[in-house]
């Protein structure tokens, strides 16, 4: 498979997860999913950075992304495209990817709290990769992708995540650049 096509295929597949992971930075806030409670170790379970509103909007915009992908495929790539999962397929896939991404982000926050890292503190790779791993895990049983796409996503996602964080910081959407 041509490298450019491989890159496009990987990004097209995972796009709802990327959107779901980015949206809470913009539309999040409100009640934290851990209700402000502490774990057995005395630290917060997850922290203030993961909220119900951010989770809801992350999943919603992930699904909207999948719906838009469906219509782009139909309009510009044709019904015989390898990317044509059908509308229902895109809704299910994007829901699984978005939910998996946000679950992975929550798990990353949970792990960071266990290591006494506060919200906003950097945890290299944990911050950049858990959302991708869980997005892929949630979706894989219904929508498997080849190993080369998985490997590519695991390599490029930290780079994309780091770059998007710098942009979000410059736009004053994040307090820290990492």
Curated annotation (Swiss-Prot):
Q: Which family is annotated?
A: Belongs to the CDP-archaeol synthase family.
Q: Which reaction does it catalyse?
A: 2,3-bis-O-(geranylgeranyl)-sn-glycerol 1-phosphate + CTP + H(+) = CDP-2,3-bis-O-(geranylgeranyl)-sn-glycerol + diphosphate
> HAMAP family per the record?
CDP_archaeol_synth
UniProt-listed InterPro entries: CarS (IPR032690), CarS_archaea (IPR002726)
Q: Which residues cross the membrane?
A: 3-23, 56-76, 91-111, 131-151, 152-172
What is the protein's known function? Catalyzes the formation of CDP-2,3-bis-(O-geranylgeranyl)-sn-glycerol (CDP-archaeol) from 2,3-bis-(O-geranylgeranyl)-sn-glycerol 1-phosphate (DGGGP) and CTP. This reaction is the third ether-bond-formation step in the biosynthesis of archaeal membrane lipids.
Per the annotation, which location comes first and is thus the protein's main one?
Answer: membrane
Query: Keywords, A to Z?
Result: Cell membrane, Lipid biosynthesis, Lipid metabolism, Magnesium, Membrane, Phospholipid biosynthesis, Phospholipid metabolism, Transferase, Transmembrane, Transmembrane helix
- Please report the name of this protein according to its UniProt entry: CDP-archaeol synthase
């Amino acid at each position: 498979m041509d490298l450019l096509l491989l890159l496009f295929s990987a990004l097209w597949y995972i796009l709802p997860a990327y959107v779901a992971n980015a949206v809470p930075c913009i539309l999040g806030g409100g009640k934290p999913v851990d209700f402000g409670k502490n774990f057995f170790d005395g630290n917060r379970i997850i922290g203030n950075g993961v909220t119900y509103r951010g989770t809801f909007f992350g999943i919603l915009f992930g699904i909207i992304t999948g719906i838009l992908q469906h219509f782009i495929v139909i309009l510009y790539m044709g019904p015989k495209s390898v990317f044509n999962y059908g509308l229902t397929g895109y809704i299910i896939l994007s829901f699984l990817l978005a939910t998996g991404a946000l679950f992975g982000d929550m798990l990353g926050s949970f792990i960071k709290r266990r290591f006494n890292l506060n919200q906003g503190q950097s945890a290299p790779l944990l911050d950049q990769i858990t959302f991708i791993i869980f997005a892929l895990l949630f979706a894989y049983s219904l929508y498997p992708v080849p190993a080369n796409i998985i490997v590519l996503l695991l390599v490029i996602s930290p780079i994309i995540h780091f770059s998007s964080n710098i942009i979000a910081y410059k736009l004053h959407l994040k307090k820290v650049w990492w």
